[in-house]
Amino acid sequence: MDERTLRTLEFAKIKEMLAERTATSLGREVVESLAPATDFLEVQHRQAETSEARRLYEGGHAIPLGGLHDLRAHVQRAVRGGVLDPGDLLDVADTAASSRRLKRFLEEQEGLPILTALSRMLGTFHHLEAEIRQAVDEHGEVRDDASPALAEIRRSMRILQNRMKERLDAFVRGSAAKYLQDPIVTIREGRFVVPVKIEYRAQVPGIVHDQSASGSTLFIEPMAIVEMNNDLRELALKEHEEVERILARLSSLVAGEADALLDTLQAVAQIDFASAKGKLSLDLDCTEPELVREPILEIHKGRHPLLKGRVVPIDVHIGITFDTLVITGPNTGGKTVALKTMGLFVLMAQAGLHLPAGHGTRVGVFQQVFVDIGDEQSIEQSLSTFSGHMTNIIRILDALEGPALVLLDELGAGTDPTEGAALAMSILEHLHKRGAKTVATTHYSELKTYAYTRSRVENASVEFDVETLRPTFRLLIGVPGSSNAFEISRRLGLSPHIVDRARQFLTQEQERVEDLIQGIHATRAELEKERAEAHRLRAEAQRMREEYERRYGDAQRKAAETVEKARAQAQQILATARREAEAVIAELKQALREQREAERMQAIQSARSRLARARQAVEPTEEEQRARRRGEVPRGLKPGDKVRVVSLDTTGYVLSEPDADGNVLVQAGILKMTVSLTDLERASEEQPAAGAGGPARMRTHGKGLAVSKAREMSPEVDLRGLMVEEALERVDKFLDDAVLAGLPQVRIIHGKGTGALRKAVTEALRHDRRVESYRLGGVGEGGDGVTVAKLRE
């Protein structure tokens, strides 16, 4: 990417914002080397990485990057055979622990393929960390127990030091006290000494190690402890040698993990960089741009990331319906800001950064981005000479190769307007032929006409409010800019006579074009008002529709709840009836064990008839259901009318007039219920109501009960796989149904197996009064796996 472009568009300031959000020096190095990529897949990967980091922070998950150090120098020194000091080793241990914590955090996340892949490069280093922490404490000092030898040496040193202190304490408190400057013991050159007044040098035999700045005090090692000091010095040398040996061993362990440590540092740098990108995206309220392979740029509500305070967002595009955009308008109206925003957005997107813009923003991957904006100054200063502009444009034309975005500020300015406009049109035409996407700002009215007469060239302008005499900073695509000089002068107080006279100096063509442009601006302003009103009305209509849908949904839910409640009540009644019937049957079974077989069969038949009647009260027949579906929505219902309850699929009679809420009381069999008119249909008179003519219908059904039962019932029951108790219960019910169905004989399949089930069935049949006889199955009947029972008539 062109270095001058990066400098002019202030890409370095974006990198500074990124660097402020890194947690390690490793991450900052990645930021410093950041440059826009020109490979589509690489840009896509960078954007996805930023989105993953942003999602973590959006979810309240901060990436744990604390405790990580740049160990590259430490590792290199260890690899060369150098010895790391305890502080360096402590950095290694801290980084190992932090790497492990970071790895675990990323592995626990879902939907982050790029960051998860980076986490696989992070080492754990359990053994290395344990070895270092066993030898080095949290203050960066080698522990006494780092080795048995070191522990013994330091123990001996403490004993010797205590003995020396005791002897020196006795010395300074004894007869020699009067010779001392102060009654203290201090250390010089690693040896214990006492401060002796210089005039008493001869009275204190010993070795002089130092003298005070004033010369009045000598620091003397008394002869009584010289030997002990010598012993202490020897122990100190041994301590140093043992510490060096320990540090060398730990350094060799670091060297052994060199490759893994360097891979970890590389992953840490990239993760820290991704974290910074995610933070910046959140802080600037950015969105991930949609990447496209075509060299286009489409910005929705884009905000220049370096501008402070309230920024008016811009909407602009190029490369879709046109390839050259000519922006006109007043100074300080935002033309240069628009140029810089477009260029910087492309650089940021190709560097993998999200953009401070709205959803729908699309960016293609440009191989080159060129700018000619002022004298490479900031947004607030964009003036330059004609020669400076032209020199840079020549450089751009010479370097132009692949798909490029070219941004030209005040094209052709700084020279004769006629020649400058001609040059500007020629340059734009040349760039268009070379396939570049070009955005140029200008004051020349000739370029407005040029844009209207060329294909894939479009006008744009920055809006100016003549009422307030201030620019609005809005960029209007398709509308050429107007100087507004006459109107502004009039509003500022210039004599109308002078303004009118000035208009006379314009050529007829110039005046016609200026009037046309002002008319376009007026029409656009009116259309903007109408569009705003239409948007307001559409929003109001949408709100009303949502309110209606909400109320309709509430009504639907209430109706469904009512239907469900009624259905539950019906099911409860049916369940109660079934329980009562089963209770009667159970009682009859118990009683009939002591009664004659005929009486027992009659009681069972009676009980099942009761069950059938209860079922018919709440469950309509198939014929009734078909009849009910022929009903119509009722009008003018009155008590006694026959109706169908749609939600329950049952019929009944109206018992009351509709109330204020449109509900009536309906009798359906044994069930009385309040039903909405919207849930009713008028039933035909031929269609029997639930509970109406019940006995007759029961008799009609009863006539064919045995025949129907016999026709539908299987003459065999399969007990295989059942426990004995469960099997006997099924046999008992099966025999009841078989007797009711009038079956002459039945087959009971129990399988061969161990024979336990067959024995239990045989024993039950032996004592059952419904069974006349029984036998094992014959050839073709299942053999010993089947028992055939003949029932009493």
Curated annotation (Swiss-Prot):
Biased composition (Basic and acidic residues): 623-639
Alphabetized Gene3D superfamilies for the sequence: 3.30.1370.110, P-loop containing nucleotide triphosphate hydrolases
Disordered: annotated span: 611-639
Keywords: ATP-binding, DNA-binding, Endonuclease, Hydrolase, Nuclease, Nucleotide-binding, RNA-binding, rRNA-binding
Binding-site positions, ATP: G329, P330, N331, T332, G333, G334, K335, T336
Protein's job: Endonuclease that is involved in the suppression of homologous recombination and thus may have a key role in the control of bacterial genetic diversity. Acts as a ribosome collision sensor, splitting the ribosome into its 2 subunits. Detects stalled/collided 70S ribosomes which it binds and splits by an ATP-hydrolysis driven conformational change. Acts upstream of the ribosome quality control system (RQC), a ribosome-associated complex that mediates the extraction of incompletely synthesized nascent chains from stalled ribosomes and their subsequent degradation. Probably generates substrates for RQC.
HAMAP family assigned: MutS2
Name of the protein this chain belongs to: Endonuclease MutS2
Gene: mutS2
